[in-house]
Protein backbone atom coordinates (compact mmCIF):
# COMPACT_ATOMS: atom_id res chain seq x y z
CA UNK A 1 0.00 0.00 0.00
CA UNK A 2 1.30 3.41 -0.95
CA UNK A 3 0.74 6.81 0.55
CA UNK A 4 -0.49 9.73 -1.58
CA UNK A 5 -0.64 12.84 0.57
CA UNK A 6 -2.53 11.68 3.66
CA UNK A 7 -4.49 9.05 1.70
CA UNK A 8 -3.55 5.40 1.74
CA UNK A 9 -3.64 3.86 -1.76
CA UNK A 10 -4.97 0.27 -1.70
CA UNK A 11 -4.92 -0.27 -5.46
CA UNK A 12 -3.16 1.63 -8.24
CA UNK A 13 -2.99 0.91 -11.94
CA UNK A 14 -1.49 3.06 -14.68
CA UNK A 15 -2.43 2.19 -18.26
CA UNK A 16 -1.44 3.72 -21.58
CA UNK A 17 -2.57 3.30 -25.18
CA UNK A 18 -0.66 0.31 -26.56
CA UNK A 19 -2.71 -0.67 -29.61
CA UNK A 20 -0.21 -1.40 -32.38
CA UNK A 21 -2.57 -0.34 -35.20
CA UNK A 22 -3.24 3.02 -33.51
CA UNK A 23 0.48 3.75 -33.26
CA UNK A 24 1.18 2.60 -36.83
CA UNK A 25 -1.56 4.91 -38.15
CA UNK A 26 -0.65 7.84 -35.90
CA UNK A 27 3.09 7.68 -36.51
CA UNK A 28 2.55 6.99 -40.21
CA UNK A 29 0.28 10.02 -40.58
CA UNK A 30 2.71 12.21 -38.63
CA UNK A 31 5.72 11.12 -40.70
CA UNK A 32 3.72 11.64 -43.91
CA UNK A 33 2.57 15.16 -42.95
CA UNK A 34 6.03 16.25 -41.77
CA UNK A 35 7.69 14.83 -44.90
CA UNK A 36 5.02 16.22 -47.25
CA UNK A 37 5.09 19.78 -45.91
CA UNK A 38 8.83 19.68 -45.27
CA UNK A 39 9.46 18.78 -48.91
CA UNK A 40 7.04 21.46 -50.12
CA UNK A 41 8.56 24.17 -47.95
CA UNK A 42 12.11 23.31 -49.01
CA UNK A 43 11.16 23.14 -52.69
CA UNK A 44 9.16 26.38 -52.79
CA UNK A 45 10.73 28.61 -50.14
CA UNK A 46 14.40 27.59 -50.37
CA UNK A 47 14.69 26.66 -54.06
CA UNK A 48 12.01 28.99 -55.46
CA UNK A 49 10.23 26.21 -57.38
CA UNK A 50 6.42 26.21 -57.31
CA UNK A 51 5.03 23.34 -55.25
CA UNK A 52 1.81 21.97 -56.72
CA UNK A 53 -0.43 23.15 -59.56
CA UNK A 54 -1.94 25.97 -57.44
CA UNK A 55 0.79 26.80 -54.92
CA UNK A 56 0.28 28.85 -51.78
CA UNK A 57 2.21 32.01 -51.26
CA UNK A 58 5.51 31.56 -49.46
CA UNK A 59 4.07 33.30 -46.39
CA UNK A 60 1.00 31.02 -46.30
CA UNK A 61 3.18 27.94 -46.76
CA UNK A 62 5.55 29.16 -44.02
CA UNK A 63 2.55 29.40 -41.66
CA UNK A 64 0.43 26.40 -42.72
CA UNK A 65 3.33 23.95 -43.13
CA UNK A 66 4.85 24.25 -39.65
CA UNK A 67 1.39 24.66 -38.10
CA UNK A 68 0.20 21.38 -39.61
CA UNK A 69 3.44 19.63 -38.66
CA UNK A 70 3.20 20.87 -35.06
CA UNK A 71 -0.45 19.80 -34.90
CA UNK A 72 0.39 16.24 -35.98
CA UNK A 73 3.36 16.04 -33.63
CA UNK A 74 1.16 17.44 -30.84
CA UNK A 75 -1.57 14.83 -31.42
CA UNK A 76 1.04 12.08 -31.40
CA UNK A 77 2.53 13.42 -28.15
CA UNK A 78 -0.94 13.72 -26.60
CA UNK A 79 -1.63 10.03 -27.28
CA UNK A 80 1.82 9.16 -25.95
CA UNK A 81 1.20 11.09 -22.71
CA UNK A 82 -2.39 9.90 -22.11
CA UNK A 83 -2.60 7.69 -19.03
CA UNK A 84 -5.52 6.12 -17.26
CA UNK A 85 -4.66 6.13 -13.56
CA UNK A 86 -7.07 4.23 -11.33
CA UNK A 87 -6.64 4.36 -7.56
CA UNK A 88 -8.67 2.97 -4.69
CA UNK A 89 -8.07 5.05 -1.57
CA UNK A 90 -9.71 5.18 1.85
CA UNK A 91 -12.26 7.79 0.78
CA UNK A 92 -13.16 6.59 -2.71
CA UNK A 93 -12.25 5.64 -6.23
CA UNK A 94 -9.96 8.06 -8.07
CA UNK A 95 -9.96 8.02 -11.87
CA UNK A 96 -7.55 10.23 -13.79
CA UNK A 97 -7.32 10.26 -17.55
CA UNK A 98 -4.18 12.38 -17.54
CA UNK A 99 -4.06 15.14 -18.78
CA UNK A 100 -7.77 15.40 -19.69
CA UNK A 101 -10.05 14.33 -16.85
CA UNK A 102 -10.10 13.70 -13.11
CA UNK A 103 -12.94 12.14 -11.16
CA UNK A 104 -13.40 11.05 -7.55
CA UNK A 105 -16.25 8.70 -6.66
CA UNK A 106 -16.93 8.28 -2.93
CA UNK A 107 -17.70 4.66 -2.02
CA UNK A 108 -21.18 5.58 -0.75
CA UNK A 109 -22.01 6.65 -4.35
CA UNK A 110 -21.26 3.14 -5.70
CA UNK A 111 -24.33 0.86 -5.60
CA UNK A 112 -22.66 -2.14 -7.22
CA UNK A 113 -19.33 -3.24 -8.65
CA UNK A 114 -18.67 -6.29 -10.80
CA UNK A 115 -15.86 -7.53 -13.01
CA UNK A 116 -16.83 -8.08 -16.63
CA UNK A 117 -15.61 -8.57 -20.17
CA UNK A 118 -16.93 -6.02 -22.65
CA UNK A 119 -16.64 -5.06 -26.31
CA UNK A 120 -14.95 -1.63 -26.45
CA UNK A 121 -15.94 -0.95 -30.06
CA UNK A 122 -19.50 -2.36 -30.00
CA UNK A 123 -20.48 -1.02 -26.58
CA UNK A 124 -18.57 2.26 -26.39
CA UNK A 125 -17.28 3.03 -29.89
CA UNK A 126 -13.62 2.48 -29.01
CA UNK A 127 -11.15 3.41 -26.31
CA UNK A 128 -10.66 6.60 -24.30
CA UNK A 129 -13.30 8.49 -22.35
CA UNK A 130 -16.36 7.15 -24.12
CA UNK A 131 -20.13 7.41 -23.89
CA UNK A 132 -22.03 4.41 -25.20
CA UNK A 133 -25.37 2.70 -24.91
CA UNK A 134 -24.19 1.10 -21.66
CA UNK A 135 -23.08 4.38 -20.06
CA UNK A 136 -19.70 6.02 -19.71
CA UNK A 137 -16.36 4.25 -19.96
CA UNK A 138 -12.76 5.05 -19.15
CA UNK A 139 -10.55 2.59 -21.03
CA UNK A 140 -7.29 2.52 -22.98
CA UNK A 141 -6.77 -1.10 -24.02
CA UNK A 142 -8.17 -4.56 -23.69
CA UNK A 143 -11.71 -5.74 -23.08
CA UNK A 144 -11.86 -6.37 -19.34
CA UNK A 145 -12.86 -4.01 -16.59
CA UNK A 146 -15.06 -3.19 -13.65
CA UNK A 147 -18.69 -2.18 -14.18
CA UNK A 148 -20.01 0.21 -11.54
CA UNK A 149 -23.57 1.27 -10.95
CA UNK A 150 -23.54 4.66 -9.31
CA UNK A 151 -26.16 5.86 -6.81
CA UNK A 152 -27.75 8.17 -9.40
CA UNK A 153 -28.36 5.06 -11.52
CA UNK A 154 -25.65 5.77 -14.06
CA UNK A 155 -23.41 2.92 -15.19
CA UNK A 156 -19.66 3.50 -15.39
CA UNK A 157 -17.08 1.11 -16.79
CA UNK A 158 -13.39 1.32 -15.88
CA UNK A 159 -11.11 -0.70 -18.13
CA UNK A 160 -8.37 -2.58 -16.31
CA UNK A 161 -5.61 -5.09 -16.92
CA UNK A 162 -6.21 -6.26 -13.32
CA UNK A 163 -10.02 -6.23 -13.13
CA UNK A 164 -10.38 -8.89 -10.40
CA UNK A 165 -8.00 -7.08 -8.07
CA UNK A 166 -9.65 -3.71 -8.79
CA UNK A 167 -13.16 -5.10 -8.26
CA UNK A 168 -12.19 -6.92 -5.06
CA UNK A 169 -10.53 -3.79 -3.63
CA UNK A 170 -13.48 -1.52 -4.51
CA UNK A 171 -15.98 -3.96 -2.96
CA UNK A 172 -13.86 -4.36 0.18
CA UNK A 173 -13.59 -0.58 0.71
CA UNK A 174 -17.23 -0.07 -0.33
CA UNK A 175 -18.46 -2.58 2.24
CA UNK A 176 -16.37 -0.92 4.96
CA UNK A 177 -17.87 2.48 4.12
CA UNK A 178 -21.42 1.06 4.39
CA UNK A 179 -20.84 -0.20 7.95
Describe each model-derived feature in a short phrase.
Residues 67-79, 128-129, 135-140:
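Short, solvent-exposed secondary-structure boundary motifs
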Residues 48, 74, 127-128, 159:
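Glycine-centered small-residue hotspots that permit tight backbone geometry or close packing
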Residues 1-59, 165:
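N-terminal membrane-targeting/pre-transmembrane regions
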Residues 159-179:
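Cytosol-/stroma-facing membrane-proximal "stalk/adaptor" domains immediately downstream
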Residues 63, 72-78, 145-150:
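Alpha-helical transmembrane segments and their immediate juxtamembrane interface regions
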Residues 58-67:
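Membrane-embedded or membrane-proximal helical elements that form or frame transporter/channel pores
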Residues 69-114:
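Conserved beta-hairpin
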Residues 13-18, 95-157:
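Non-transmembrane, membrane-adjacent beta-strand/coil modules in membrane-associated proteins
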Amino acid sequence: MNQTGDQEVHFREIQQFKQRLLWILLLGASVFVVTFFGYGMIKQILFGQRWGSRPMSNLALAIVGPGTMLFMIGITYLFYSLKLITEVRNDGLYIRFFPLAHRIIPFENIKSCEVRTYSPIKEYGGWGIRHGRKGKAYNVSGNRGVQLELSEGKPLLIGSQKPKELGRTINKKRNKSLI
